[in-house]
């Protein structure tokens, strides 16, 4: 994946989330949302590897969405079209992706993948997500580093990755609290959330989800054996 100073560098940790969703949902008839998409690595990987029917990727940063669009084009798509309306098509089967970008209509990027689709949407969390739109799965790798810790991070992270994508507020849990509440409004009954977490946040995030009404909470470890993803189901 291409990256710049506007997005996080994709890490092996995030593969844990992608691999688990692919394992849990082999069926293609799935509506999925990736909140805080950044470079688009999660959403694009799930759209292509999972072949899912409908994937939406959301980020507050217009610059980040430009990177995600670039990745969609560079990794999977060949470009056709005019200055006002671009279309993209995957050059290899079986995906046959045709992606149309409506440049004159704001930040929404609509990709048509035959019966599947990929959408990039600029939004401050769920603000621009229509209230009646529901999903089967919502995934997120939100900012989760406590504010006071950021200045002590490795220079390659602190100085070259956007603070917007790192800073999880005072205790690092701000976005999990918001997501736990907002995701429940957009999940179909029985739908699941998958949140990437810091290695020491599993208990706190699990508690947040429990209080918000989620059930079947599971902590998933990454390859080195560290807590990396929390999965939970919404049954209301």
Predicted feature residues:
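Mobile active-site "lid"/loop adjacent to the S-adenosyl-L-methionine
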Residues: 144-174
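Conserved Class I SAM-dependent methyltransferase catalytic core
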Residues: 2, 170-233
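Class I S-adenosylmethionine-dependent transferase superfamily signal
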Residues: 21, 46, 157, 179-183
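Conserved SAM/SAH cofactor-binding pocket of Class I
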Residues: 16-84, 93-95, 99-102, 106-109, ...
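Pre-signature/interface helix of ABC/ABC-like ATPase nucleotide-binding domains
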Residues: 1, 33, 118, 155, ...
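C-terminal beta-strand of the catalytic ATP-binding
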Residues: 144, 233-236
